[in-house]
Design a protein with these regions (language model features):
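N-terminal, post-signal-peptide region of Sec/Tat-exported proteins
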Residues: 53-76
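Outer-membrane beta-barrel porins/channels
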Residues: 26-43, 47, 51, 89-90, ...
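Short strand-turn segments of transmembrane beta-barrel domains in outer membranes
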Residues: 48-51, 75-85
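Bacterial Sec-dependent N-terminal signal peptides
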Residues: 1-29
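Short glycine/serine/proline-enriched coil/turn segments at secondary-structure junctions
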Residues: 68-69, 84-87, 157-158
Length: 243
């Protein structure tokens, strides 16, 4: 049906991305692009204009400095969204905990973007050329991000407030049993409020975020890739430039 066809096309696209001819490191224009989707209904409704104004648990995503807006009690943010007619699913959850007289805040965020039930058609065609749909199995392609946030007020006066914050983020990406990657990166942000004016700055991937990919194929899968003139991928590193 049409849905399975869409998933099959998605599978071919994903596998194509995983087939570098040799091991190397390179900057990708759209590396870890799932981290740019957004978080929270308010942030998305405002066109992502949250860096200066965010002051709840979702600040771990938009600008960790905004976590200092969470006072007295912990704050939780949850979000679920679906894309491409429900084929891709996006989940977001975050927690902010104020500590030390509301001057410091700890935060944790979890993001997941995934396409589930992708048909694996590597063994659809038998050696004799016949088609065997019983050989088609499903797999998932999922991207995860774990954000550990810290924010602190460095000035808290009636006419001027300044907060700073940072994220340490761990990336995990998995495509069935074929490929997986671990990555690490840092973000930093600042919020300044002076009377009725608010200014926010957010720097992502300030140390350059990397994903270290590893691949695992059975001998049968390698044979199919070889016979169909596809390269067998090996370990590589994907880099995300600061922005």
């Amino acid at each position: 049906n049409q849905e399975n066809m869409k998933k099959s096309l998605a599978a071919f696209f994903l596998i194509g991305l995983l087939l570098p001819g040799k091991s190397y490191s390179q900057f990708r224009k759209y590396s870890n692009e799932f981290l740019n989707i957004g978080a929270g209904a308010r942030g998305l409704a405002m066109g992502n204009a949250q860096v200066a104004s965010v002051n709840d648990a979702s600040a771990g995503y938009w600008n960790p400095a905004g976590l200092t807006g969470v006072k007295d009690v912990p704050n939780i943010a949850l979000m679920h969204a679906e894309y491409f007619s429900g084929i891709a699913k996006y989940e977001y959850a975050s927690l902010a905990i104020p500590v030390q007289d509301n001057k410091r805040t700890l935060g944790f965020s979890l993001l997941r973007f995934a396409v589930d039930d992708i048909p694996n058609t590597l063994f659809l065609v038998e050696p004799d050329g016949s088609i065997n749909y019983n050989n088609v199995q499903a797999f998932s392609s999922a991207d995860y991000a774990f954000l550990f946030s810290f924010a602190q007020k460095i000035k808290d006066e009636d006419d001027k407030k300044i907060s700073v914050g940072a994220n340490a983020k761990v990336i995990y990406r998995k495509v069935g049993h074929f490929a997986s990657a671990w990555g690490f990166g840092l973000d930093a942000g600042i919020q300044i409020q002076r009377k009725k004016w608010r200014l926010g700055l957010m720097a992502r991937d300030i140390t350059t975020t990397f994903n270290a990919w590893s691949f695992k194929f059975t001998e049968q899968e390698k044979e199919v890739l070889y016979l169909t003139k596809n390269d067998i991928p090996i370990k590589s590193t994907e880099l995300t430039a600061p922005r």
